[in-house]
Structure formats: structure tokens, C-alpha cells
Amino acid sequence: MKYRRGKKTNHKVFGEAMAILAGDGLQALAYEVMLSCIAKSDNMGYEILKKIKAANEIVMAAGTEAMVSGQVMDINSCSDKDSLTMLEKMHRMKTGALITAAVVAGATLAGADERQVVAFRKYGENIGLVFQMVDDKLDVSGDSRTLGKDIHADERNEKTTYTALLSPEELDDLIRKHTQDAKEAIEGVCVCPQGLMKLADDLMLRCG
């Protein structure tokens, strides 16, 4: 990948070693921000427990049981014709885990109860899959100037994608299904669902 958001990627500008260090530094900074917030809390009761749970959600998503394992699967999928089940598992652990962590952490800090957290988790998992499906679709049908990144990169790298395993019609149906599942998950449990509903719709409509 040479471009992201219309600019050259970190490793193309500064080299792979500096890019890896930048990633390590940013991840450590995220932990620093979260733990500093916890350490400065005067209230050692419910409020600090919410912060710990939110931080744990993010750390777990970035760790060996989620993003790291998903990335290993992605690397090993090169030149393989993986099943749709394996592809979905990989993206649940990568993109899906990070998006879900952001949603659940936010809900936890806002005081969501257990039932609401389950609903937000389901929303995040489905949105994560939709995000990747749309991304795969745009990689073969989008414009690099509009997207701000290289296209056909997955094909060149012989990666297994949703577009490689499904017809355009099947992929569109799956995008609609997971979008609807995400929206239904938070119906009746989210006080102000409009923003999250719009996010789901906008993501689906992004691919036309």
C-alpha cells in the first residue's frame, strides 16, 4: 500500500523500520492515555471500574486474541482460497474487533448496562464486517483519487477477499444483511440511536 487518504503511507516516506516504531509508539501512547486517566481518578468505585473495563476492551482488541491473530491469518491467506467462514473470522478479529472495541468502550464509559453492552457489541461486530465488505468492493470498483489510496492492491497481492469469493449480487445482499443486523441490535436499547443508525446507512451507501 503506497497511499492512504491521498498521502503516501508512513513506510513509503520514512521506511518500514520507522513506520513500525511509530505504530509501537502510538499503541503505547494509547495505553498511557487510558491508564493515566484511571490513575488520576479520585473515585475508586463505579466510575473507575467503567474506565478499567473500557481500557480492557481496547487492549484485548489490539492483542494476540484479536487483531494480531487476525493479521496473522491475513498474512497466511496470501495465495490461498479460503472459505467465506474463515474470511469472516479473520475480519471479525481485525477490523471488526477494533470497531467493536471503540463502540463497546464508549458505551461502557457512558454507563451502559450488561444488556446494552451486548447490543452494542453486536452492532460493532456487524459494522466491522460491513466496513471490510465495502472496502473490498471499492478496491475493485472505486477510484484511487476519490478513495485516496491504491486500488486493486488485494488482487495484486493475491489476497482472499469478499469480491473473490462472492458475486456482486451476493456481496450486496450480505452488506445489506449485516447493516440491518447492526441497526436491529441497538433498537430499543440505545437512548439516541440516530447517529449510529446513520453511520450504518452511510457505510452501506458508500459503495453505491
Q: Where in the sequence are the language-model features?
A:
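Mg2+-dependent prenyl diphosphate-binding active-site environment of isoprenoid biosynthetic enzymes
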Residues: 1-204
